[in-house]
């Protein structure tokens, strides 16, 4: 239970309200740098496929991935919106603003994530994410 909302067990379907409640908590954890809180959202046997990073299996590599991700970003502002739900799969639109730790430049990023939920936790996290210097033009994808 999170923020007074119970999450589905097994592979029961998720409601929009449940997904929004989870996303609100995830955003708070990312912006607050709560690595343990984020890792606790995943079961021990989780799988993470994040961008070009090799697939990570288990919470120890996941912790490393999240720690490295947050270490590069200062003044992180995150917005996550659930754009689709298919029973136990949540499709998330993710937008981030931050200052790059090494260059000091303002950055912006956009991504799409698919979370496969099990027992109220993120069993599989798949994400595509791109980032550019804030104000830079994004390349248009060829159709």
Per-range role (PLM):
Residues 29, 41, 68-72:
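Short hydrophobic alpha-helical module
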């Amino acid at each position: 239970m999170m923020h007074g909302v119970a999450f589905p067990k097994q592979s029961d379907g998720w409601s929009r309200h449940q997904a929004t409640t989870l996303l609100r908590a995830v955003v708070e954890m990312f912006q607050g740098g709560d690595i343990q809180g984020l890792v606790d959202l995943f079961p021990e046997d989780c799988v993470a496929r994040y961008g070009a990073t090799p697939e990570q299996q288990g919470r120890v590599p996941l912790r490393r991935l999240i720690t490295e991700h947050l270490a590069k970003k200062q003044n992180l502002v995150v917005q996550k919106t659930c754009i689709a739900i298919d029973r136990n799969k949540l499709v998330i639109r993710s937008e981030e603003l931050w200052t790059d730790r090494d260059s000091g430049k303002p950055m912006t990023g956009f991504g799409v994530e698919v979370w496969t939920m099990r027992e109220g936790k993120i069993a599989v996290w798949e994400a595509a994410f791109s980032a550019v210097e804030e104000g830079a033009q994004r390349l248009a994808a060829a159709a």
